Amino acid sequence: MSEQTRREMFCGIAAAMLSGTLLPAQQAEHIHHAVAEARANGKYAPKALTTHEYATLEHLSEIIIPGSAAAGAPAFIDFLCSVCDDMKDIFTGGIGWLDEQMGHRYQVAGFVDARPEQQTAMLDLIAYRKNASPELNPGIHFFDWARRMVVDGYYTSAAGFKEVGYMGNQGLSHFSVPQEPLQYALKRCPV
């Protein structure tokens, strides 16, 4: 597959996610594979986000789902941002908004510099649409995206599969119909 074709494929995946459709596991597998290739020589180097933005995303990921950073959720998101400008705008703008709000509210340089209770208080404000206001709407929109993408990135990774006990499609050496439902169906049959 040529690099241009791969890029078009990844951009199509990102565009589908922006339209609100769920990410099929096969497409997520392609993204995780591409991230693994990028990580092959050591630690993942962000492709779309700045070092600060990526560190903030890692921190947010860990708050949303502990263990998601090690499972590659931030790299999954960054990779999609690298092929989709709209998604990149959501994350760079959202992280910038979050840092700015933390500065106004707590006089810190950014989200990662705040104390855990300050971070939790801020996320509690933007976690629920019932708190919608002109001031909080950008954060609510961003955090909604961040949560969904962290969940997608984590639960389509090997660690996420392991957590839920997903083994993939398994071949059966022998198949038999369970007798209890079969007997129940036969008893109800009028013939």
Where is each model-derived feature located?
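Coiled-coil-like amphipathic alpha-helices with heptad-repeat character
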Residues: 1-2, 142
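Residue-level marker of structural boundaries
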Residues: 18-19, 128
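Generic structural signal for individual residues within well-ordered alpha-helical segments
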Residues: 7-10, 120
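Sec-dependent signal peptide hydrophobic core
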Residues: 13-17
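General helical structural elements
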Residues: 10-11, 151
